[in-house]
Amino acid sequence: MKVLAAMSGGVDSAVAAARLVEAGHDVTGVHLALSRNPRSHREGSRGCCSLEDSFDARRAADRLGIPFYVWDFSDRFVAEVIDPFIAEYRAGRTPNPCLRCNERIKFAALLERGLDLGYDAVATGHYARTKVVDGVTKLYRSVDPGKDQSYVLAVLNQDQLSHSLFPLGNSLKMNVRQEAAALGLSVADKPDSNDICFIPDGDTPGWLSEKIGSADGEIRDESGALVGHHNGYHHFTIGQRRGLRLGVPAPDGKPRYVLDIEPVNNTVVVGGAEGLTVHHIEAIRPVWCSSEPVETWHGQAQVRAHGDPVPAIISAVPGGVAVELEDSLRGVAPGQAAVFYDGDLVVGSATICGTDRAGVKAEQAA
């Protein structure tokens, strides 16, 4: 098989490429240049967009003896990932850019170019598994629960999944590092990428302030009483406690959290922890990556990349998905992805637009 190995400059993508070479595939390494100014990203970053990362990817490819190229997708990355990220925060929502990057860049722009050039598949170092069942490529969790990345891949459709390879899905991270060391790969001990790759130093509020600006606004409690001020609602997300400048203490003396963000009024609403409890989720733009389920079914819902799945009743409704949680969740924010599982099988995903806490309607978030 002729395979494009997406090489970020990290240990996982390097070992994934090595395994494909060992399996006898015709492998070409590709590093995606996603920043218009890669020197603006700090050296030693834990992202994947710095010059240092591209050099690490090239060294790994040289060690494996495979061709290597750097492909510039920076313009498309801005249009498909960065601009929507800014727009979501401006609208008071909390997006996950990694899902968008997988959907629109790694398994769209890269895959499209690869197929045009005669490649059969794109491979990455994600910790997830696929299996073809009755002609359908199904997505599953990794065997390493601590590193499972199926959540950020749940936006992929059947066409994308059928041309995707995840060589690390049956491996533990500790074994991958050992394998990298045995192969003589210089990235064997390189730290994992945890930051948003296009935000220097991980300062998301500061970065957003440069893009959106900072407008002073009010912080009010659920009764509407003024309790503080803020210098930009994009500094906050649902469930946040830190950074609240409150001049009026809560009557019960307990901590207060962000319960809602009202961008139209430039207002942040705060309240007690009990106000974060969610039992019902509304979501839009569903993607059924492992075949469309029945109209209503029992499964599990996960709302954060490293969150715990919660038993739920999941129903297809006009315009999206309704989720009744059997166990409540806290701090669920519009803009997050809800990913639906049946055990280890990833059934699909959708974008959260409202909860019984926030009360946001689907048409407002569309």
Curated annotation (Swiss-Prot):
EC number(s) recorded for this UniProt protein? 2.8.1.13
- InterPro entries, sorted: MnmA-like, MnmA-like_C, MnmA-like_central, MnmA-like_central_sf, Rossmann-like_a/b/a_fold
TM ranges are: none
User: Mind telling me which GO cellular component terms the entry cites?
Assistant: cytoplasm
The highest taxon in the source lineage is Bacteria
Q: Which UniProt keywords apply?
A: ATP-binding, Cytoplasm, Disulfide bond, Nucleotide-binding, RNA-binding, Transferase, tRNA processing, tRNA-binding
List the cysteine pairs that form cystine.
101-197
Q: Which CDD domains does this chain map to?
A: MnmA_TRMU-like
Q: Does the keyword tRNA processing apply?
A: yes
Quote the subcellular location field of this record: Cytoplasm
* Any one Gene Ontology molecular-function term assigned to this protein's record: tRNA binding
Name this polypeptide is given: tRNA-specific 2-thiouridylase MnmA
* The species this protein was found in: Cutibacterium acnes (strain DSM 16379 / KPA171202) (Propionibacterium acnes)
This chain is encoded by the gene named mnmA
